[in-house]
């Protein structure tokens, strides 16, 4: 991936000696990016222009100035937020090729000598807001597409919500089988979708080419001046046109910057502009009657195929968001912002294709509750913008840290860009926050719940670590005493998993206390997560000899990797340790937590932390340790 001189830590990529192969690969990735990256923003024309016009006209007939003003706002929002902010700047802030708010947080946080708690807090908020968006996108996308049947026949109205629930149930049910096979058709279907919406808009632009005057920003100024109070509310609806822009950055690691940029500039951006302009021309031709312009401008035989295609496109958009939620959750787990959760790999070739049963179930329940509770896409639209605008504002703040501390840009350049982007983000956020009582509370409630859970887990883990360290014996002290006065030694190797390699693990102390024996070779093993997506094998293992009985081993994994302890320990052979899984026993401590008024956290937070800990996946399965080689020792800890 080619990078400008931004000072990024990304390693240079060797140029291919076969340009025709590289060109073919780029085209394939572009096609894939259409289905995964642009599914969300690509389905926004179904409802964005309509909702903006309804807001500007109070549900009555829209005036010519309103139509041109709304269209101009959409055009320039797509240009500034997506093309300039994300395409030109944010996509360059990759963390070893990976993107997303947690990747950006890890990159920014790593630039501080001591990992900044403030940056961690900003990252938690950003991730939580993403989940607020992730539950609304499938609901509003599929619901708005199915509502297209009302244009075909109004008698379909009673079946809109039930059919939407059936489609969503199928989407969530098939997650366990993976998206490898289905994913092959995502790109082509989405390509047909963009071509179809572009052509449907072009037809009406040709009929009324004067609509293209909306490209002039003076219509925005006139719209804002004429009715500032109405314009303020309308801006919140305008933002629906750019929801999904954050997916460009979130999926950076899957496709790379070049295919994402080329797909936007050559296909997505032009087709979106054509469709929005076509909707504007269509409403002008109807003398300002809003209705449902996206579907209504596809007259005659084209209407039903467009409804079917829209439904397929919204399902693909939903799939992209669900996959993104799985990926973000895995990153949060690896960065110790959430407890270990069960992760199932659905592809032998692509490590990024994963399925998380609990996350999938929670998403399905919340999405379906939103569909039933709101009932119409127009009502859901009020709930949509808050979490996305908040996420974009978080990205702007973290981008400023990267520009100043990692890229080493001049301060005035970084401040100028940050002020511009933040001004737009805050403007959109402010216009959306007024919709809290109209439905915006839904996404905020989801985000707040995630923030509370992550904050409790991070805080509780810190308290538990500190308390455990205070009560444990330093490893070096214990190892020295055991060397002087050896207990009975048994053959083989014992590996003790611990989060604190400087202290004697609880499992080791219980083994000495109850069994009075020690293995000939004892390994104190800790697993840490680096602030980068992938760690090369050369940096995977760090070994340190304590004495002839004990050795300290640290395994390092990237936040996008699934820890595999046996495979990582095999690397130790190159460093002199003849690791043999068949003569090795793994000792794990299983803690039973009890709430204590002296933990430093409120009792309710103690109980929440304990509840989260109980949901954690089994360490044996999570670290992929053979079950026949594991010994678990239970302990009770009051926090």
From Swiss-Prot:
Belongs to the HAK/KUP transporter (TC 2.A.72) family. The chain crosses the membrane at residues 29-49, 67-87, 117-137, 154-174, 182-202, 220-240, 260-280, 302-322, 354-374, 383-403, 411-431, 436-456. This is Probable potassium transport system protein Kup 1. One of its GO terms (cellular component) is plasma membrane. Residues 1-16 have a biased composition (Polar residues). The gene is kup1. HAMAP family: Kup (MF_01522). GO terms for molecular function: potassium ion transmembrane transporter activity; symporter activity. It comes from the Bacteria. It comes from Mesorhizobium japonicum (strain LMG 29417 / CECT 9101 / MAFF 303099).
